[in-house]
From Swiss-Prot:
Gene expressing this chain: lspA
Cellular location(s): Cell inner membrane
Any GO MF annotation of the entry: aspartic-type endopeptidase activity
InterPro entries (alphabetical): Peptidase_A8
Function field: This protein specifically catalyzes the removal of signal peptides from prolipoproteins.
A Pfam match: Peptidase_A8
Name this polypeptide is given: Lipoprotein signal peptidase
Enzyme Commission number(s) of this protein: 3.4.23.36
Spans traversing the lipid bilayer: 9-29, 69-89, 98-118, 133-153
GO terms (BP aspect): proteolysis
Top-level taxonomy: Bacteria, Pseudomonadati, Chlamydiota, Chlamydiia, Chlamydiales
Length: 165
């Protein structure tokens, strides 16, 4: 295994581990509470609100397409396999930022697919809000997917200029 492949594998493993350990910690903590209350932790900073409140999502982003579980699962697996094939089988060097964005995308997808395999749904637990408005609950895998997508799209639309030698 080349050093590039090894570092890619380790990076994906690291991000997936962050996602799975955080979800497991939240679920174990929730299971130890006598009343299984929905909010495990809440912190307010002025008008900003941060909550740890586990919820379960059977669809895609924000629960959409929850009626198409098997189709979504197949799409997720195809995306993971496509990204892994690109990362590990491509001989030509890829820019580090594109490579990192694909590592984040793949890690997030693997994290959520792991949830589906182990729990039959995706475990979301991070909730943020401002005054009375709350963003839909999410997890670290969702953060990785969003950040990876942002970096990927940014690098496609605003590529760095290469000096011609």
């Amino acid at each position: 295994m080349s050093s590039r492949s090894r570092s890619t594998f380790l990076a994906i493993s690291f991000f997936v581990l962050i996602d799975w350990v955080s979800k497991l910690a939240v679920l174990l903590y929730r299971g130890n509470l006598p009343d299984a209350r929905p909010i495990l932790y809440q912190y307010s900073w002025g008008k900003l609100i941060f909550c740890i409140c586990p919820t379960f999502n059977e669809g895609a982003a924000f629960g959409i397409f929850s009626k198409y579980k098997y189709f979504l699962f197949a799409i997720r697996i195809a995306i993971i396999l496509g990204i892994l094939a690109f990362l590990f089988l491509r001989k030509k060097r890829t820019s580090p930022s594109i490579r990192f964005s694909l590592i984040l995308l793949c890690s997030g997808a693997i994290g959520n697919v792991g949830d589906i395999l182990f729990y039959r749904h995706v475990v979301d637990f991070i909730s943020i809000g401002f005054k009375r408005w709350y963003f839909p609950t999410f997890n670290f895998a969702d953060i990785f997917i969003s950040l990876g997508t942002f970096i990927f799209v940014y690098k496609l639309y605003f590529p760095t200029k290469q000096k011609i030698k």
